[in-house]
């Protein structure tokens, strides 16, 4: 008779890798799941888990003293309004994006951030590997924004941003600019593959401009499309 522990080490199609299970259950990457396994905080049937171990649906997995349950891959696209924080905890009474979601989705984590004064597309997922691939600079996931400036952008500054980038304290910032409307020097389509904190606002501020509106429309293969402000849509994961 096969015991649960023996079943965990099999390689047939009825099993899955432990690190994948842990990653989805905790919303972390598989690399982070492997680190938890190495640290000895994950058990399978009350036995210390092993790297590379496989499990079945009958195995009992715990992280610390907390039982972990199987989770399906989830991804939602949220249209964040201005005035909401991409955080679980409210600060000074400012609402968070989780107040726009049903409690059944509160386990999802945002992929990147938009500051309180910005609006547009936010991805939330329980897949840590997907989040890593969408946010790490080495994967070059393009993001698209509609940006309004407090004054017309000078041609020299546009060329500087497009061709050379702007030096910031945390390194050069390279953006691609295109007018939203011909002849309008206030409103720009900004594309970038990085995602440093308030990078667009800081880039323009370094040249003497204030961003009065910042709205994200696209993130990688995902677009806001017709999702209304404050609402969300569930979709499938693609990178």
Where are these regions (language model features)?
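Basic, flexible Lys/Arg- and Gly-enriched helix-loop patches that mediate nucleic-acid binding at interfaces
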Residues: 2-239
């Amino acid at each position: 008779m096969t015991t649960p522990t023996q079943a965990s080490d099999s390689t047939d199609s009825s099993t899955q890798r432990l690190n994948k299970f842990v990653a989805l259950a905790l919303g972390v990457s598989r690399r982070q799941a492997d680190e938890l396994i190495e640290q000895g905080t994950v058990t399978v049937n009350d036995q210390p888990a092993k790297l590379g171990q496989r499990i079945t649906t009958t195995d009992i997995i715990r992280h610390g003293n907390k039982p972990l349950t199987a989770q399906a891959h989830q991804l939602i696209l949220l249209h964040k309004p201005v005035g909401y924080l991409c955080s679980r905890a409210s600060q000074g009474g400012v609402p968070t994006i989780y107040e726009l979601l049903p409690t059944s989705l509160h386990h999802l984590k945002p992929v990147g951030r938009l500051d309180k004064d910005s609006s547009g597309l936010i991805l939330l997922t329980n897949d840590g590997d997907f989040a890593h691939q969408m946010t790490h600079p080495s994967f070059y996931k393009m993001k698209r924004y509609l940006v309004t400036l407090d004054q017309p952008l000078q041609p020299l500054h546009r060329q500087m941003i497009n061709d050379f980038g702007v030096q910031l304290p945390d390194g050069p910032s390279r953006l691609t600019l295109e007018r939203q409307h011909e002849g309008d020097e206030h409103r720009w389509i900004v594309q970038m593959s990085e995602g440093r904190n308030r990078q667009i606002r800081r880039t323009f501020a370094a040249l003497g401009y204030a961003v009065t509106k910042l709205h994200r429309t696209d993130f990688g293969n995902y677009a806001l499309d017709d999702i209304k402000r404050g609402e969300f849509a569930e979709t499938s994961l693609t990178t």
